[in-house]
């Protein structure tokens, strides 16, 4: 049985894959910091909203979660993401996201560190 925090992070990751900007923005603090290792760092909910608008490229995504670990205000989720573009070309990625909440009960995400590798 999933805990409340495990469900929260599972739903958040599903929102990322589906491009559900509303769900994503409701789940983070105003001062969110999202560090994508080897790429960009997004600081603040306004910058995150701008980045989410730029992510809708018409690709279809599926996610297979391998592990979802929570402890207190922190969580780690890893797995595979499968992407199919408009022409049918597929790409596959391995990912690991590390999360920190602003508080233990009913917290929102205030820090994300993401590692993504094309495989």
Stretches found by the model and what they are:
Residues 33-42:
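A short gly/proline-enriched turn/hairpin at secondary-structure junctions
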Residues 35, 49-119:
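A beta-strand edge to alpha-helix "cap/lid" segment located at domain peripheries
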Residues 18, 43, 71:
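Short glycine-rich loop/turn motifs that provide flexible caps or phosphate-binding loops at active sites
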Residues 1-26, 30:
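Short, low-complexity N-terminal intrinsically disordered segments enriched in polar/charged residues
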Residues 13, 40, 67-69:
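Structured beta->alpha junctions
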Residues 41-50:
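Short beta-edge strand/loop motif at the mouth of beta-sheet-based domains
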């Amino acid at each position: 049985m999933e805990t409340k925090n495990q469900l929260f992070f599972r739903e958040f990751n599903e929102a990322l894959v589906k491009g559900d900007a509303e769900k994503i923005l409701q789940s983070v603090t105003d001062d969110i910091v999202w560090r994508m290792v080897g790429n960009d760092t997004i600081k603040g909910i306004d910058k995150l909203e701008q980045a989410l608008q730029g992510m809708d490229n018409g690709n279809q995504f599926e996610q297979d979660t391998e592990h979802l670990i929570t402890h207190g205000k922190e969580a780690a989720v890893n797995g595979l993401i499968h992407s199919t573009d408009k022409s049918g070309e597929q790409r596959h990625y391995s990912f690991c996201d590390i999360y920190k909440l602003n508080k233990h009960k009913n917290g929102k995400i205030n820090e994300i560190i993401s590692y993504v590798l094309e495989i």
